[in-house]
């Protein structure tokens, strides 16, 4: 696994100059993913010197995890920079020479084809037959036409019909089925193929949304997610390079790895502190006056804080918010955590000695003909493999070798995570043989897969607006505590960042980065006069 070097302490680092420490607010950042690192970097750059980062795992990066797999760098987590101009991740990568030169043709990545730059997606049935390219294109046009309609409910304020149950999946399935069924030019066999392809497209869409099913995704809110124009870029050296750039000026003493947090105590009064005289303050130094917040770690260590920036994933907050915060979160914030959605999207990488696919093939899409009329794409445990929607060919082979990347989401992804490598490799090989009709496909040389759902410090891949939730819930999740600006309650004791707290860019790396910068800027604004005064004195 690639590791990130944190800069060693030196006389010119942000902690050794600038504002005098004894005036500094104590800031604890929980989590060293993109949001936490962006918040920390922004705080240090703006003169804050008493910043501590607590990361539960043994590495930085969060849901960015680049793995060296032979000569190839594979992404278990974040893969693409979505869009160009206006995307801070893109500009960071471009300014630091992380992106390769690409042609216009190479940059035209389709919405459904997840990985490849060139070539053709092969839609294969479970009978081992390839669906003709013209039929695939015909269906794709129909699906994309309906997809555009799903955006209009939010963007144009279009009312949602009760029959859709405010569900992207139900709306899409019903309308596409209706259009297919009423088409007078198609034979019954063609209609069945298209209906089967619809189910496959919905599986892919679920992987992209990180939802167990598109039936769970809110139709009225779907169009609020904002796409930045431009291509989807892959970083050849690994997305971890972005993590390293964010972390390179963070001194090593700021960052504590392997430091899971047990509880965040906020609105901590002087009376509370009287009984805690034996609790040591392990921040870099102590600011005069009581600390309104205290962070209690699993190993028994405590950190006093004026401000705590929480970047835990929505999955972790769903699992632990009732015990993680003392006092408990306000009811409306807890309700927003409950209403918003997060599921698991996992990747399965298979390495082969030689390609069994043709040179123009950029992906193998699994179309189950017996699923044409299913209303639900949830499966019993023994059929978890049916949720694998496709295998994409990693491109170019000079970089990746002969590598396929499979996609699976929802509860079936969690079931996959529980299986051993041998079982998953065998099942994937059988699927590839079945759908290509080639019984001579060998087992892969090696397998690598993600396990975001069962990772106790992540618990899912990324968030979505579930039926019953809205952008307002994202705003409530992001709102700092305490809510009231009372003179008796110190402000901004607990701040919230992470992709799930960005109303327009949830589920993205740029949303995560921007959310961290947003919370840092709240503190910069709060201490504007102090920072200016101390900078003038320096």
What residue ranges belong to the model's regions?
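FAD-dinucleotide binding site
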Residues: 1-538
């Amino acid at each position: 696994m690639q590791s990130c070097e944190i800069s060693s302490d030196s006389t010119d680092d942000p902690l050794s100059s600038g504002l005098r420490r004894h005036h500094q607010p104590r800031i604890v950042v929980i989590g060293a993913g993109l949001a936490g690192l962006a918040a920390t970097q922004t705080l240090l750059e703006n003169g804050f010197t008493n910043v501590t980062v607590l990361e539960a795992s043994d590495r930085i990066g969060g849901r960015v995890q680049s793995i060296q797999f032979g000569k190839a760098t594979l992404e278990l987590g974040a893969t693409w920079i979505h869009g160009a101009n206006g995307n801070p991740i893109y500009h960071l990568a471009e300014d630091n020479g992380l992106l390769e030169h690409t042609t216009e043709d190479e940059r035209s990545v389709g919405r459904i084809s997840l990985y490849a730059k060139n070539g053709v997606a092969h839609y294969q049935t479970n009978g081992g037959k390839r669906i003709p390219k013209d039929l695939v294109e015909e269906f794709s046009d129909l699906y994309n036409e309906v997809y555009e309609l799903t955006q209009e409910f939010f963007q144009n304020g279009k009312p949602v019909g009760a029959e859709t149950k405010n569900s992207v999946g139900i709306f899409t399935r019903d309308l596409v089925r209706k259009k297919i069924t009423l088409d007078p030019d198609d034979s019954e066999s063609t209609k069945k193929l298209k209906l089967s392809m619809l189910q496959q497209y919905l599986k892919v869409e679920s992987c992209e949304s990180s939802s167990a099913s598109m039936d769970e995704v809110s139709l009225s809110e779907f169009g609020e997610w904002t796409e930045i124009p431009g291509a989807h870029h892959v970083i050849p050296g690994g997305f971890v390079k972005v993590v390293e750039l964010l972390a390179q000026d963070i001194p090593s003493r700021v960052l504590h790895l392997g430091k899971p947090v047990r509880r965040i105590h906020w609105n901590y009064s002087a009376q509370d502190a009287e009984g805690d005289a034996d609790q040591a303050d392990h921040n870099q130094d102590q600011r005069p006056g009581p600390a309104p917040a205290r962070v209690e770690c699993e190993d028994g260590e405590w950190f006093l804080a004026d401000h705590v920036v929480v970047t835990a994933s929505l999955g972790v907050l769903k699992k632990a918010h009732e015990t993680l915060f003392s006092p408990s979160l306000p009811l409306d914030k807890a309700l927003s955590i409950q209403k918003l959605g997060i599921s698991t999207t996992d990747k399965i990488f298979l390495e082969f000695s030689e390609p069994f696919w043709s040179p123009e093939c950029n992906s193998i899409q699994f179309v189950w003909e017996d699923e044409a009329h299913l209303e639900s794409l949830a499966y019993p445990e023994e059929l978890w493999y049916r949720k694998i929607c496709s295998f994409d060919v990693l491109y170019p082979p000079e970089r990746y070798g002969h590598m396929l990347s499979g996609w699976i989401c929802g509860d079936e992804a969690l079931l996959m995570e529980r299986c051993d490598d041998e079982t998953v490799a065998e099942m994937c090989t059988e699927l590839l043989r079945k759908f290509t009709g080639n019984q001579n496909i060998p087992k892969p040389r090696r397998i690598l897969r993600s396990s975001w759902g069962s990772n106790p410090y992540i618990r899912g891949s990324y968030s979505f607006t579930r039926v019953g939730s809205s952008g307002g819930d994202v705003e409530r999740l992001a709102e700092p505590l305490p809510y009231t600006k009372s003179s008796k309650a110190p402000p901004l004791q607990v701040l919230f960042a992470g992709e799930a707290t960005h109303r327009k860019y949830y589920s993205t790396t740029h949303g995560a980065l921007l959310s961290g910068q947003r919370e840092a800027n709240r503190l910069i604004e709060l201490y504007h006069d102090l920072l200016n005064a101390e900078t003038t004195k320096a």
